[in-house]
């Protein structure tokens, strides 16, 4: 693989360094310079929410890893789903349509275009997809249904921004479906759908599994890709931890955010 006609420089660079080799780069300067453009926020969030959401969405940082600490759930992770919904609400209000330079209008057509070109949300598990859809319904009255689905449904698709939500934070569950949860190909496809911004949610236990996992060659390759993502964001950006006490049901939960800057 050489030229890439989709992703900006930061997103291409991660794929180049980890999988495709240094020749893999944006086909043109215009593609390489793509970034999301956000209008100023129309409404104020909860204290704590605004800062956390703003830090994750900052257009100057195209690749963001969000690691939830102190959460133990199996295939459905309500805290992660609620965070994804809040990020989505902020993007729906603020993300501008590259065609018009204006935020997507608050109409059925606006919702359709937002989910067609602006954002989609990827999750490996139907339980987590259901949890995200439930939380999305709670943050806004959508006139066109949100695009939340598995990576298989996203192949060949692209959007300005993508949110990837793994959800699974129970090690036994992850080990039971290791080749699925730790599929390097699935993670790679998820990471290479967006043109300008990719935000990945990985609960801490997935990044620190028991040693049994490395005996499975395919799963070990996927874990290595997750750890490479963490390292890439650390080396090329900055890290900050947020207390999620402002969220319902998230007492004691922390979110470590690593974001790789625009290259």
Segments predicted by a language model, with ranges:
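Conserved helicase C-terminal RecA-like lobe
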Residues: 90-192, 201-209
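Amphipathic alpha-helical transducer elements in NTP-driven molecular machines
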Residues: 5-8, 12, 81, 85, ...
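Helicase C-terminal subdomain and adjacent C-terminal extension
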Residues: 137-140, 171-263
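Short, surface-exposed amphipathic charged segments that create phosphate/polyanion-binding patches used
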Residues: 12-18, 40-43, 160-166, 257-261
């Amino acid at each position: 693989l050489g030229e890439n006609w989709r992703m900006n420089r930061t997103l291409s660079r991660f794929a180049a360094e980890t999988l495709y080799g240094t020749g893999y780069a944006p086909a043109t300067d215009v593609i390489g310079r793509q970034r999301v453009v956000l209008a100023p926020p129309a409404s104020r969030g909860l204290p704590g929410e605004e800062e956390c959401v703003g830090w994750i969405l900052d257009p100057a940082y195209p690749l963001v890893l969000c690691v939830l600490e102190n959460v133990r759930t199996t295939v459905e992770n309500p805290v992660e789903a609620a965070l994804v919904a809040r990020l989505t609400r902020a993007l729906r209000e603020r993300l501008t349509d590259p065609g018009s330079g204006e935020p997507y209008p608050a109409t059925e057509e606006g919702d359709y275009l937002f989910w067609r070109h602006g954002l989609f949300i990827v999750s490996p598990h139907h339980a987590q997809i259901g949890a995200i859809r439930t939380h999305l319904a709670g943050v806004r009255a959508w006139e066109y249904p949100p695009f939340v689905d598995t990576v298989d449904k996203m192949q060949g698709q692209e959007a300005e921004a993508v949110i990837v939500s793994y959800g699974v934070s129970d090690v036994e569950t992850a080990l039971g479906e290791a080749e699925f949860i730790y599929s390097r190909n699935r993670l790679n496809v998820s990471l290479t759908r967006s043109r300008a911004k990719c935000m990945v949610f990985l609960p801490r236990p997935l990044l620190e599994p028991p040693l049994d996992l490395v005996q499975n060659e395919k799963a070990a390759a996927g874990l290595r890709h997750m750890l490479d993502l963490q390292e890439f964001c650390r080396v090329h950006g900055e890290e900050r931890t947020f207390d999620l006490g402002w969220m319902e049901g998230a007492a004691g939960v922390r979110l470590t955010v690593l974001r790789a800057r625009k290259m």
